[in-house]
Amino acid sequence: MIMSVCLPWLARCRRFLIVSLAFAMLLLGIWGTLPFSLSDHGTAIAALEDDRYDGNIFVVYAGNGSLVPPRLNLRESFERKLPVILVYYLDDSKDCKQYAFIVSRMQEFYGRVASIIPVSVDSIPDQKRFRRDEPGYYYSGGVPQTVILDKSGKKIFDAQGALKFEVVDDVLRDLFDLLPRSESMELKQRTYNEFNSELVD
């Protein structure tokens, strides 16, 4: 008699425990697959101050999806006789994350007259020799690295680190024969008197 009363109740309890245990395991399984930042902080956070991968740095930190992939590759830029700005980067480098906005500013001011080519160093083949029209030719091993080539392909600038915009801007102003920043915040080309090469106001 007692067994006949207890058995259905035990069966129901057992079923409830199995369902509860399965649900708890499911929740723990989902929680364990969440990104580290989400399980730690409760929200997904893209951070400038760490070396964690958050996505393409130009999209996430510069709000600029037009830089990658570049409009022209290095060979095409040489064929069109365009000056080139090569920027070597890694998506999981905090220095590159901080530099992404500066690269976007370069495009804003010089994107119509120069070929801006961001190069993920992960995409450079592991080989010893490169041709001049391959990005690996100019890469020196660190990120971020900025290399500027004139329209003949001659290297006129090569520096590593997250540079200030003004550093690159000075090189490009000289390359494009623009007024110094002290004389013009806007990018205006120098004007010359037809009788001499003095700067005209």
UniProtKB/Swiss-Prot annotation:
<protein>
    <recommendedName>
        <fullName>Thylakoid membrane protein slr1796</fullName>
    </recommendedName>
</protein>
<keyword id="KW-1133">Transmembrane helix</keyword>
<keyword id="KW-0812">Transmembrane</keyword>
<keyword id="KW-0793">Thylakoid</keyword>
<dbReference type="InterPro" id="IPR048069">
    <property type="entry name" value="Thylak_slr1796"/>
</dbReference>
<keyword id="KW-0472">Membrane</keyword>
<feature type="transmembrane region" description="Helical">
    <location>
        <begin position="16"/>
        <end position="36"/>
    </location>
</feature>
<dbReference type="InterPro" id="IPR036249">
    <property type="entry name" value="Thioredoxin-like_sf"/>
</dbReference>
<dbReference type="GO" id="GO:0031676">
    <property type="term" value="C:plasma membrane-derived thylakoid membrane"/>
</dbReference>
